Amino acid sequence: MGVLSNKIDKEQLKPGDHIYSWRQAYVYAHHGICVGEGKVIHFTRGAGQEIGTGTFLDRIIFSSSPAHPSDNPCPRCGDSPRLDGVILSCVDCFLCGGDLYLFEYGVSHALFLVKARGGTCTLAESDPPEDILHRANFLLENGFGVYHAFKNNCEDFAIYCKTGLLVSTSISVGRSGQAASLVAAASAIVSSPLRFLTTSFSGLAAVSYGMYCVSRLVSDIGVRRDIVKVPVERLVANPSF
């Protein structure tokens, strides 16, 4: 892996790794947890399910569904009893023809800001592999709630499996770096009063990018104050947590 790319080979995968693959020309990334033997547990949205956005994101995020239809199952995955929610797939079906990337944990502030695209790393530290795999397998059996693009998506699922951390406030966009980046980008352009301090395009771009970086940083699960550690059994017993 390099500073600007987290791309890895399948041979480098280890159980407990948080992986992702870009969809729709790098518009959106799908995330999951590697559990070994070439399998991935991930949280996905099935066909015909609403996620509450009412926007083009409904069509984009449908790309997180498995690559094989139910009437033509993958020979490695087998005849899966469900194609939405928390599911188990082989790595190839998870990638859906895309490249494989490793999500990084415990990065420095400098590296976090260099990786300007959200949804690739976090300042938060990862738990040991045995804890990660326990959460992922428990949620495979019990579910992770209703998929929502901004508040409960595949990246939220993977980050929870890796850290056990949940957002305790109801006004948040969740743990997802992708969702936080979208909100940060919009806020940087529309909401910042600093944009009135410059009239040049380059000045506006610099101010907007600075606000974007600050918004991303304060939204990261590794620095937020509204984060609590929740055992997976408690999460399943109280899904409205």
Question: Predicted regions: what is each one?
Answer:
Residues 1-241:
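Cysteine-nucleophile amide-bond enzymes
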